[in-house]
């Protein structure tokens, strides 16, 4: 994978998270379940061999690549709400990268959750509950919280709150990854075509 492919894959991870948050907040459900599984998988992969492994392979991140193309393209399919979520994820991730102590603690806490899943076979709900707690304790205090729009009936459910925070944490993970592989905000202005061309190429590979 070249640097642009890596950046687009990370952006696809962010886009998948934002899209999933919107869908869950509006409908109270997230289908297919593989989307959530891919994002949780990305959180628990701390020493991957390559960037695709973070998401369990290119096939799993394909919906995120498609979502990124919709958001970054010049067509009418852009969703302002998803864009706002993406901006919020980038903002919080930049704050996180400026606090290495919090970043290290985040890694330690996620390692604990990974151990719970592998050694004690915790159910998905328990894993989401743990990951949501990490988001609430370590990410939320970093700055202006990401305001989630949706159906109040769905948003007040504890299970959905845990799920949304887990999805946001996965989005933060992808946003950090994007910056670690050289992603810059100016790329959205000066390198948009390059990113979109790369995304289209990845779709044909995935």
From Swiss-Prot:
Pfam families registered for this protein in UniProt: DUF489
Domain of life, per lineage: Bacteria
Localization: Cytoplasm; Cell inner membrane
Keyword Zinc-finger: no
Extent of the signal sequence: none
Protein family per UniProt: Belongs to the HflD family.
UniProt keyword Membrane, yes or no: yes
Keywords, alphabetical: Cell inner membrane, Cell membrane, Cytoplasm, Membrane
Matching PANTHER family: HIGH FREQUENCY LYSOGENIZATION PROTEIN HFLD
Gene3D superfamilies on file: HflD-like
Protein name: High frequency lysogenization protein HflD homolog
Membrane topology of the entry: Peripheral membrane protein
Chief localization: cytoplasm
GO CC annotation: cytoplasm; plasma membrane
């Amino acid at each position: 994978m070249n640097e642009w492919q890596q950046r687009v894959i990370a952006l696809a991870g962010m886009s998948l998270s934002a899209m999933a948050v919107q869908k869950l907040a509006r409908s109270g459900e997230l289908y297919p379940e593989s989307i959530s599984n891919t994002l949780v998988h990305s959180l628990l992969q701390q020493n991957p061999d390559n960037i695709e492994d973070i998401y369990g392979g290119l096939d799993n991140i394909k919906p995120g690549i498609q979502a990124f193309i919709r958001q970054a393209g010049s067509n009418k399919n852009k969703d302002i709400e998803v864009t706002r979520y993406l901006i919020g994820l980038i903002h919080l991730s930049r704050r996180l990268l400026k606090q290495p102590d919090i970043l290290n603690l985040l890694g330690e806490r996620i390692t604990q959750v990974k151990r719970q899943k592998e050694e004690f076979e915790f159910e998905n709900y328990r894993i989401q509950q743990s990951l949501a707690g990490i988001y609430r304790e370590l990410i939320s205090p970093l700055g202006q919280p990401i305001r989630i729009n949706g159906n109040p009936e769905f948003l007040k459910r504890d299970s959905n709150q845990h799920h949304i925070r887990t999805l946001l944490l996965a989005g933060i993970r992808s946003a950090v990854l994007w910056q670690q592989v050289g992603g810059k905000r100016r790329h959205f202005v000066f390198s948009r075509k390059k990113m979109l061309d790369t995304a289209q190429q990845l779709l044909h590979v995935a």
